[in-house]
Amino acid sequence: MTAINRILIVDDEDNVRRMLSTAFALQGFETHCANNGRTALHLFADIHPDVVLMDIRMPEMDGIKALKEMRSHETRTPVILMTAYAEVETAVEALRCGAFDYVIKPFDLDELNLIVQRALQLQSMKKEIRHLHQALSTSWQWGHILTNSPAMMDICKDTAKIALSQASVLISGESGTGKELIARAIHYNSRRAKGPFIKVNCAALPESLLESELFGHEKGAFTGAQTLRQGLFERANEGTLLLDEIGEMPLVLQAKLLRILQEREFERIGGHQTIKVDIRIIAATNRDLQAMVKEGTFREDLFYRLNVIHLILPPLRDRREDISLLANHFLQKFSSENQRDIIDIDPMAMSLLTAWSWPGNIRELSNVIERAVVMNSGPIIFSEDLPPQIRQPVCNAGEVKTAPVGERNLKEEIKRVEKRIIMEVLEQQEGNRTRTALMLGISRRALMYKLQEYGIDPADV
């Protein structure tokens, strides 16, 4: 059901109030009226209108004073002022005090309606943006970072403190370990959360384009610069700029970046005007910047400016306790996105996932699960749904056999080991199916499916 917009009409002339109230009521508005500024303030506090239409010249309290009083308590509701005096000074003062717009009497009702509709549309957009910011802030809370790893839990605790500061941050780690995720979490938990978060990959652009992308350029600064263009430093003002793959930034641009970190100012390419910015810089790299400093390929002074706080993210192979957690998260995500009813990953498949070294880290795990979801036709992901390099036959718990075998023998070997693992865990848990499913990292429903497939009776274990 569409919400009814509430309008507050304030005018000391009875005929104007009646005319406007009738006109907006016919358009579906809930109308409220006041004949002076003081009464309007009481109604404003009581009914919380979506828009206010108010005359400027009124006894007791004029529209400008009433507007100032409204703005001292609440700044979001659009206020449109009406005046019979076509005075530029009055209009300027009204806008300076926070009016959305003003109209001059006598006015055309259609024109006034357009102004009111524009005010409501803008208000709706602002409300949606606030909700999006709130949703982003909620989705990037520390509790939403999936981990059972003590090392990652410590990083999350440290990062929560870092977010409250204004210090530059350097995030190191292999590709796919979640450097951008941590950078976003810092931003959305900081005082800059309502500002922009912008990412640029320093390795993705050649030097000339990267400079233009970062610093912007004036019209005519170089061939093809037909218009003025703001750079990312300018667009990230009051927000956060993530410089990904900072180790790939050319030395000449490193010097310009150092100035921004020190002075918070720069000039566009081809420009002479110094532009001040208020931004937080987060740099990310999968390279050893200290080694690059020794080699002379990275500026030492820039390294120390960026390295105020250094976070080192562990690779996925060093946080194996997170693999099943992340795999199940990606399973739910991609099943929903692809409208598939895939409910679980079977124990043998999960064992293979846990044993794999994951050179591509979390990004590789995400891709593997997405592929399995897309290609699978049943309710459970099995070992044969995994890529060949992962689904190698298991000799015993934790060991992967590397000798090549035929596809037929591979499936038989996987099923044999899977059955043995289920029986061993069932025996350890004294036939308790709920605890067995928990230990195997699968749902009770998936365990029942496997018990039936292999003809295992928990009472016989």
Swiss-Prot record:
Annotated phenotype, changing D55G: Decreases phosphorylation. Significant decrease in ability to respond to acetoacetate induction. 40% decrease in cPHB accumulation. Cannot respond to acetoacetate induction
Protein location: Cytoplasm
Domain Sigma-54 factor interaction intervals: 145-374
Matches recorded under PROSITE patterns: RESPONSE_REGULATORY (PS50110), SIGMA54_INTERACT_1 (PS00675), SIGMA54_INTERACT_2 (PS00676), SIGMA54_INTERACT_3 (PS00688), SIGMA54_INTERACT_4 (PS50045)
Residues found modified as Phosphohistidine: H73
Any single GO CC term annotated in Swiss-Prot or TrEMBL for this entry: protein-DNA complex
DNA bind region: 433-452
Domain spans labelled Response regulatory: 6-120
Pfam families attached to this UniProt entry: HTH_8, Response_reg, Sigma54_activat
GO BP: any one term: positive regulation of DNA-templated transcription
4-aspartylphosphate modifications at: D55
Disruption phenotype: Deletion of the atoSC locus renders cells not motile or responsive against any chemoattractant or repellent independently of the atoSC inducer's presence.
Gene3D superfamilies attached to this UniProt entry: 1.10.8.60, 3.40.50.2300, Homeodomain-like, P-loop containing nucleotide triphosphate hydrolases
Annotated binding of ATP, by residue: 173-180, 236-245
PTM notes: Phosphorylated by AtoS. Contains two phosphorylation sites, which are both involved in the transduction of the acetoacetate signal. Asp-55 is probably the primary phosphorylation site, but either both residues can be phosphorylated independently by AtoS or the phosphate group can be transferred between them.
GO molecular function, one term: cis-regulatory region sequence-specific DNA binding
Major localisation: cytoplasm
Keywords from the named record: Activator, ATP-binding, Cytoplasm, DNA-binding, Nucleotide-binding, Phosphoprotein, Transcription, Transcription regulation, Two-component regulatory system
SUPFAM superfamilies per record: CheY-like, Homeodomain-like, P-loop containing nucleoside triphosphate hydrolases
Functional note: Member of the two-component regulatory system AtoS/AtoC. In the presence of acetoacetate, AtoS/AtoC stimulates the expression of the atoDAEB operon, leading to short chain fatty acid catabolism and activation of the poly-(R)-3-hydroxybutyrate (cPHB) biosynthetic pathway. Also induces the operon in response to spermidine. Involved in the regulation of motility and chemotaxis, via transcriptional induction of the flagellar regulon. AtoC acts by binding directly to the promoter region of the target genes.
Protein name: Regulatory protein AtoC
Organism per entry: Escherichia coli (strain K12)
Gene symbol of the encoding locus: atoC
